Amino acid sequence: MKIYLVGGAVRDALLGLPVKDKDWVVVGATPQEMLDAGYQQVGRDFPVFLHPQTHEEYALARTERKSGSGYTGFTCYTAPDVTLEADLQRRDLTINALARDDDGQIIDPYHGRRDLEARLLRHVSPAFGEDPLRVLRVARFAARYAHLSFRIADETLALMREMTAAGELEHLTPERVWKETENALTTRNPQVYFQVLRDCGALRVLFPEIDALFGVPAPAKWHPEIDTGVHTLMTLSMAAMLSPQLDVRFATLCHDLGKGLTPKNLWPRHHGHGPAGVKLVEQLCQRLRVPNDLRDLAKLVAEYHDLIHTFPILQPKTIVKLFDAIDAWRKPQRVEQIALTSEADVRGRTGFEASDYPQGRWLREAWQVAQAVPTKEVVEAGFKGIEIREELTKRRIAAVANWKEKRCPNPAS
């Protein structure tokens, strides 16, 4: 029995990155020998065991053979005669097909170290094409390591295009697509994930609402980058710099979906694209089974982001109604989230990356003012039932009006 550290832990250690999870491969052992050594079996489809002390995963070396469609259509073979090289060959990328033995020696049969040094994401073997989920995984790795200047090897991108064109991605379940997307959205450069999907044709298959934005022009005065798809990825990049929150990043990604519905004869203007985009956000989220809290914020951002940009000319009544509409009284975090997505929208434009966004500050300040109006005083004044809410709204509007006159005057007044 020989045990090797494999995959991501070896890769990240060689890159000088923190190692989070460790995966191990056991060569020359049977399931019974693992159980006798105190390991606990947890794998259902193939033998995976938990270490009795560390609870890290130890998998018996295995090979895989394509036996059906999609990413689940594989038959696994596990036996003591399966070599480490055979186990590593089934992995997706050469940089993930690395192992380290007890003495610290690196086993690298597929030149993963060379590709690490060259900053290349390259597939190990033609078997890559048998698993459509790998298209998304490579896009996610491209996003994860973009800050280290990694790129996808030409032959790997070509294979990803072939897989997409062959309809392989249609076998992916919504849950797996969303899981990879969720992980990609939390990387330092989530926009790279969607750019890679577009480069191989997968964006049109998996995210048609986003793909439809490419080639749709916006007024050059407000959008020097012109293309709405380009703007969308720029705003996502900016959102990633502004916030680590998945909610903020996903909502920013979806903020302009409505522009994909604008008839060509009305280009480059997109009046009413905010409310129009709400249905597309709903459609995308329903198809991929996106969590409800992410969906709800994305719908609000789609509908109201342009309103936030006009904050200086908003009436106090409109501002308080906005807080009602986003349910800020029960979910106050939404004020900050919407301020951030709106800022990402403005700064996600060519030449505007370093722009100040005072509207975000004013939105936050107005919220603090409105929130500070005491409900207790309204109740103690004798108001009852629906009168309490009506009086509270009046007092909030008055408080915001007083604040706005001092801190955020209407430029037209």
Curated annotation (Swiss-Prot):
Textual note on the cofactor: Magnesium is required for nucleotidyltransferase activity. Nickel for phosphatase activity.
A UniProt-annotated Pfam family: PolyA_pol_RNAbd
EC number assigned by the record: 2.7.7.72, 3.1.3.-, 3.1.4.-
Binding-site residues for Mg(2+), renumbered to this chain: D21, D23
Amino acids binding ATP: G8, R11, R91, R137, R140
Catalytic reaction equation(s): a tRNA precursor + 2 CTP + ATP = a tRNA with a 3' CCA end + 3 diphosphate; a tRNA with a 3' CCA end + 2 CTP + ATP = a tRNA with a 3' CCACCA end + 3 diphosphate
InterPro entries membership: CCA_bact, HD/PDEase_dom, HD_domain, NT_sf, PolA_pol_head_dom, PolyA_RNA-bd, tRNA_CCA-adding_enzyme
Cofactor: Mg(2+); Ni(2+)
Residue ranges occupied by any HD domain in the UniProt entry: 228-329
Family: Belongs to the tRNA nucleotidyltransferase/poly(A) polymerase family. Bacterial CCA-adding enzyme type 1 subfamily.
More info: A single active site specifically recognizes both ATP and CTP and is responsible for their addition.
Subunit comment: Monomer. Can also form homodimers and oligomers.
Name recorded for this polypeptide: Multifunctional CCA protein
Native organism: Salmonella paratyphi A (strain AKU_12601)
